[in-house]
């Protein structure tokens, strides 16, 4: 989408993601701090228009993918979710920690109900596009690593 939000609202969102550029690959943010933002509310409303009225944000991650701090990332599927506590439930695992936060790989039936929304707060064009997507790959279920 182009011009999803006015420039001022994108600036508001960008201010939430002002992280130490040397800190780490992705800074996981406290979703509670985003709830009061009118710009985030507008994005949530747009997502609900397409994903349904029950859609809600569950995680926000800021990535600094600028030329000075970029890193290589091969094709992959995001397969983990952040959880508050560890409960042994059939189909969930393995467990990991990312920046001290607990994550688990859930059954694919959980993953396939999730939608990722990516906002670029810096100018993006065909020469610096930070993300490549394999269209339709979500219909293939869990894809093995070599694929």
Protein language model regions, located:
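Non-heme Fe(II) oxygenase catalytic core, chiefly the N-lobe of the double-stranded beta-helix
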Residues: 5-147
């Amino acid at each position: 989408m182009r011009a999803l939000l006015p420039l001022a609202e994108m600036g508001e969102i960008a201010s939430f993601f002002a992280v130490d550029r040397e800190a780490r690959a992705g800074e996981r943010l406290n979703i509670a701090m985003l709830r009061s933002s009118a710009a985030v509310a507008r994005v949530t409303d747009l997502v609900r228009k397409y994903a349904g009225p029950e859609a809600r944000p569950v995680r926000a991650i800021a990535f600094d993918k600028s030329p000075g701090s970029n890193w290589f990332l091969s094709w992959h599927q995001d397969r983990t979710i952040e959880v508050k506590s560890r409960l042994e439930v059939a189909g969930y695992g393995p467990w990991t920690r990312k920046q001290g936060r607990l994550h688990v790989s859930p059954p694919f039936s959980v993953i396939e109900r999730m939608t990722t929304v990516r906002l670029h707060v810096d100018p993006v064009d065909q020469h610096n596009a930070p993300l490549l997507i394999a269209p339709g790959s979500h219909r293939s279920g869990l894809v093995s690593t070599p694929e």
